[in-house]
Amino acid sequence: MAVSSLSIRCGGFSPTISHKTEILCPNPSLKACCLLSSGGKADSSESTYQKGSGNNWKRRQALVGVGTLVATSIPATLLLAEEIPKSYSPFVDREDGYSYYYPSDWREFDFRAHDSAFKDRYLQLQNVRVRFIPTEKNDIHEVGPMEEVVYDLVKHKFAAPNQVATIYDMKERVEDGKNYYTFEYGLRTPIYATTSFATVAVGNNRYYTLIVGANERRWRKVKKQLQVVADSLKILQI
């Protein structure tokens, strides 16, 4: 992979169902660990990929309860048939075609230009959020090879100009015929640093991105917990 700015450095639950109202928002096996000096244009960490001002984004009200879940969503009933990891709850968005798990004690919140988001009660940097953009592609493989896709996302979409980005690991999984790229990366400034997992997939003419992360100082403690979240993203047929 020849990129001029790249230097190589080895190295019991409560289901949540989405019910939405339209509002106007005011505003992917690792071949090498990559140390990137970001040159992409961004307002803040990952802000370039969060662009969406002037588009119609959706704010949701969460309805909690197995009865509601079964009554409103067939894909959700299938999710219930699976073993939900202890201390996690499933989020199912039948309308937009995706689902994932999040820690049961996290709270829902609004994250600009994202379709859904949950965060730790006390640590704001410890959160998960999902967004999607339109695409004519049918699978993440059509976007490109995993190494190229991950590099482009981290360098050009996630990192701000004042951040150094490091890609630690990446992997691919196939589930129900759908391909997913999941990768671990860090963003660092002189003031603070974060580490995250991201999972990307394509389906329903949409490019889905899930990001779950935490402050770098807490990463060793919460990495396994957040890995479950990153690996849980599923594309549901609309």
From Swiss-Prot:
Please provide one cellular component term from the Gene Ontology annotations of this protein. extrinsic component of membrane
Gene3D superfamilies named in the record: Mog1/PsbP, alpha/beta/alpha sandwich (3.40.1000.10)
Q: Which InterPro entries match?
A: Mog1/PsbP_a/b/a-sand, PsbP_C
Which compartments is it annotated to reside in? Plastid, Chloroplast thylakoid membrane
Inactivation phenotype: No visible phenotype.
Lipid bilayer topology: Peripheral membrane protein
Q: Which GO terms describe its molecular function?
A: calcium ion binding
Keywords, A to Z?
Chloroplast, Membrane, Plastid, Thylakoid, Transit peptide, Transport
* Main subcellular location of this protein, as a coarse class: plastid
GO biological process annotations for this chain's record?
A: photosynthesis
Q: Show the disulfide pairing.
A: none
The job of this chain, per UniProt, is described as: NDH shuttles electrons from NAD(P)H:plastoquinone, via FMN and iron-sulfur (Fe-S) centers, to quinones in the photosynthetic chain and possibly in a chloroplast respiratory chain. The immediate electron acceptor for the enzyme in this species is believed to be plastoquinone. Couples the redox reaction to proton translocation, and thus conserves the redox energy in a proton gradient. Required for accumulation of the chloroplast NAD(P)H dehydrogenase (NDH) complex.
Q: How does it assemble?
A: Part of the chloroplast NDH complex, composed of a mixture of chloroplast and nucleus encoded subunits. Component of the NDH lumenal subcomplex, at least composed of PnsL1, PnsL2, PnsL3, PnsL4 and PnsL5.
In terms of NCBIfam families, this protein maps to: PSII_PsbP
Family (UniProt): Belongs to the PsbP family.
Q: Which PANTHER family does the annotation name?
A: PHOTOSYNTHETIC NDH SUBUNIT OF LUMENAL LOCATION 1, CHLOROPLASTIC, PTHR31407
This chain belongs to the protein called Photosynthetic NDH subunit of lumenal location 1, chloroplastic
Output the lineage of the source organism. Eukaryota, Viridiplantae, Streptophyta, Embryophyta, Tracheophyta
What gene makes this protein?
PNSL1
